Amino acid sequence: MGNFRGHALPGTFFFIIGLWWCTKSILKYICKKQKRTCYLGSKTLFYRLEILEGITIVGMALTGMAGEQFIPGGPHLMLYDYKQGHWNQLLGWHHFTMYFFFGLLGVADILCFTISSLPVSLTKLMLSNALFVEAFIFYNHTHGREMLDIFVHQLLVLVVFLTGLVAFLEFLVRNNVLLELLRSSLILLQGSWFFQIGFVLYPPSGGPAWDLMDHENILFLTICFCWHYAVTIVIVGMNYAFITWLVKSRLKRLCSSEVGLLKNAEREQESEEEM
């Protein structure tokens, strides 16, 4: 992650998966309330989506792991350089380990929805584990760095740790849509904050560099972090409104088609009686 693209990659991953989790939670909730939405509310569809989600998470994790190891100048799976007598790019191994635990989450997703004997709640436990590992890694990621660098990573640790707590609560309290949406909003915040860290530490396109020892920059980024979270709340709200409208409009079309079929059946019955 020693450049802007290295922060944009996990930022994109987390933002996409956060938006998907938000959409899935809202869709499940609306479909339970509107039971006539037919196939949209079927367990078979959601099980297939969970398996597809697991495959996607595994693919994202493998992409991140390969990127950390095999980029030019990367560690190339060598943890210790015996010739030089020191550890080899441990920060890259930090990121590799983070991706690895999210890969385990994807594997758990696939197994829990293909093997009926496994508890579905295992996925929430694996998500909580992955997030706690990520928080632990980034907490110990910035020793000896500049003040602003440490601060933006501390904010990242805060949101990751809170997301892990929410995921663990979901493990204990199942099918709570508010907890699911809170977790989704925090994952979205994590994704957008990765981008913000990239802009601060590695300004793209030759932009002006941030003074990493300026206290006013810390004051601004404190406000900026709150703005990021406000945007994620707006995204969740807009997503909820859109999915509600989409499901209800589909329900209206189904109802109108059912009414039309009933009218046609009545007309056919009346014509048969007349004959």
Swiss-Prot record:
Keywords assigned by UniProt, alphabetized: Membrane, Transmembrane, Transmembrane helix
Top-level taxonomy: Eukaryota, Metazoa, Chordata, Craniata, Vertebrata
Family indicated by similarity: Belongs to the TMEM45 family.
Protein's cellular compartments: Membrane
UniProt topology in membrane: Multi-pass membrane protein
InterPro entries: DUF716 (IPR006904), TMEM45 (IPR042127)
Protein name: Transmembrane protein 45A
Gene: TMEM45A
PANTHER family: EPIDIDYMAL MEMBRANE PROTEIN E9-RELATED, TRANSMEMBRANE PROTEIN 45A
Bilayer-crossing regions: 7-27, 51-71, 100-120, 150-170, 218-238
